[in-house]
């Protein structure tokens, strides 16, 4: 029963993600609170390093973010490490966030073949899913078009996605800044092609779209990587 939604809640959940996020940012500012129950954080805060500790820590962070942040982002692996108990803990935390009306992003960085990623829509975007979230993060390195199905499912359910384009980890630069040798964006960086694909999904939207990017602004000497 934990995942049940009223008709009013379901109507609100189906509204456009980009619009809801934009409205939340206008009300609370641009802050998105990352909820990442690392082992050391749990220890420092006096919680057990287990699924219950991760849940209690996350609930405390939710209470602090409520009414102060535009959204919260959960690091999926920090719950997955505890197996089924950790997933159940994340389900309860997501439910609590929905009850508070906080926009939720699950940072799962999923990706794969279209037949694989289509399952993610059932996990995160269906109205009665226990892991229902407002948005998830995706990896596009099977080809950005491999994500078309899950993106369309997200949009059809009023959800959003964040696609990794230009990330902060230095190890990613060799791939993300590589120059495409063929295809629609030949001569451009991989990051540019990903961003352009996302833009196509948002075409025609007024204001913020629902297909977003994970993008770290490059230093002045590295600005060419996004071109």
What are these regions (language model features)?
Residues 9-74, 85-89:
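Conserved N-terminal beta1-alpha1 strand-loop-helix module at the mouth
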Residues 76-129:
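N-terminal active-site wall of soluble small-molecule enzyme domains
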Residues 31-35, 72-74, 104-106, 136-138, ...:
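Hydrophobic faces of well-ordered beta-strands that scaffold small-molecule active sites
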Residues 215-222:
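Conserved small/polar residues in nucleotide/adenosyl-binding loops
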Residues 36-40, 77-79, 109-113, 141, ...:
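Active-site beta-loop-alpha junctions enriched in small/polar residues
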Residues 62-68, 99, 151-156:
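Acidic (Asp/Glu)-rich catalytic clusters
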Residues 114-124, 128-209:
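Conserved anion-binding
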